[in-house]
């Protein structure tokens, strides 16, 4: 899980979602998981 000030899609399978007021990227590739913070 990378924590970044701005989250972006890295590949076509990345999806930007909101969980508990946080913006996150979830993907099939676990290296692409990001959270805004």
Curated annotation (Swiss-Prot):
One of its GO terms (molecular function) is structural constituent of ribosome. The keyword RNA-binding does not apply. Pfam families: Ribosomal_L36 (PF00444). SUPFAM superfamilies: Ribosomal protein L36 (SSF57840). It comes from the Bacteria. One of its GO terms (biological process) is translation. GO terms for cellular component: cytoplasm; ribonucleoprotein complex; ribosome. Keywords: Ribonucleoprotein, Ribosomal protein. Belongs to the bacterial ribosomal protein bL36 family. This is Large ribosomal subunit protein bL36A. It comes from Streptomyces coelicolor (strain ATCC BAA-471 / A3(2) / M145). The gene is rpmJ1.
